[in-house]
């Protein structure tokens, strides 16, 4: 079995000049795909997004494991209301840093790698052993991908 502990952090920005619905949907799809991958490998997956459900409820799942968790996670992802204002992603990252674990892999997914988010990711990298930044982009479009980040082509 795969004994990883993974935390997916997904930025769903709904209130900025960066907002494009297809990009936000790509970020949600990337989170779903990665969760599916890790859960099928047997990892324990936690998930947090700054997106909100139609009830304004924060979307957080802790320590999911097993194939059945994929359905629960996808249900929550499908509940993200892109018409609702999202919380500040950089602040969300900073809030988890005091409780971050060295043994956990953190995967941050954002369509807008702006300074405050990159600073928060860098701070998380200084506290956690493994942090991966993924930037979804539409194939053929020029997007500035920060050094060390991975592009997720859609």
Language-model features: where?
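Exposed, interaction-prone extracellular/peripheral surfaces
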Residues: 1-154
């Amino acid at each position: 079995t795969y004994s990883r502990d993974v935390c997916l952090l997904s930025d769903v920005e709904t209130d900025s000049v960066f907002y494009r619905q297809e990009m936000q949907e790509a970020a949600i799809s990337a989170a779903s795909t990665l969760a599916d991958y890790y859960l099928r490998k047997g990892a324990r997956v936690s998930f947090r997004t700054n997106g909100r459900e139609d009830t304004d409820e924060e979307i957080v799942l802790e320590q999911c494991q097993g194939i059945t968790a994929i359905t629960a996670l996808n249900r929550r992802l499908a509940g993200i209301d892109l018409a609702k204002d999202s919380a500040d992603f950089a602040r969300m990252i900073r809030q988890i840093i005091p409780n971050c674990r060295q043994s956990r892999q953190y995967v941050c997914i954002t369509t807008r790698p702006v300074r405050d988010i990159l600073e928060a990711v860098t701070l998380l990298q200084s506290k956690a052993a493994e942090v991966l930044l993924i930037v979804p982009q539409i194939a053929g479009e020029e997007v500035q991908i920060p050094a060390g980040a991975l592009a997720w082509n859609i």
